[in-house]
Amino acid sequence: MRHYEIVFMVHPDQSEQVAGMIERYTGVITDANGKIHRLEDWGRRQLAYPIQDLHKAHYVLMNVEATAESVEELETAFRFNDAVLRSMVMRTKGAITEASPMAKAKDERDARRAAISERSSEADEVEENAEESAE
């Protein structure tokens, strides 16, 4: 079996169905005794250029170990699914399991937001305590 990196973009109006699509596509891989090494749902993102007059799409990244037949089946499923705007399948030298730069950036952004909200809630508590002691 070979290692592949698969990225597909879904129409933004179909974002609710992405979970089902991921389940169906990972099922194609696992049914053929393949392995999913990394699966990241990047969510809606801005496109670099419009595709079918759309400026956003829902991105999904998968790193898999699979047979060529199951990857062909996936590509066919992408081609015949109107909700999939674009897809790309690349063969890689080995399994990639660490988080992608996109996922790392999202984690850092979430951590910063959590720290900011924590600081603001602490400041609110200090203000409330100051008001109570003034009364």
From Swiss-Prot:
Keywords: Ribonucleoprotein, Ribosomal protein, RNA-binding, rRNA-binding
Listed Basic and acidic residues bias regions: 104-122
Region (Disordered): 98-135
Skewed-composition ranges (Acidic residues): 123-135
Single GO biological process annotation from the record: translation
Gene Ontology CC annotation, any one: cytosolic small ribosomal subunit
An MF annotation (GO) of this entry: structural constituent of ribosome
UniProt superkingdom: Bacteria
InterPro entries, per the entry: Ribosomal_bS6 (IPR000529), Ribosomal_bS6_sf (IPR035980), Ribosomal_S6_plastid/chlpt (IPR020814), Transl_elong_EF1B/ribsomal_bS6 (IPR014717)
Family in the record: Belongs to the bacterial ribosomal protein bS6 family.
Task performed by this protein: Binds together with bS18 to 16S ribosomal RNA.
Protein known as: Small ribosomal subunit protein bS6
Species of the source: Shewanella amazonensis (strain ATCC BAA-1098 / SB2B)
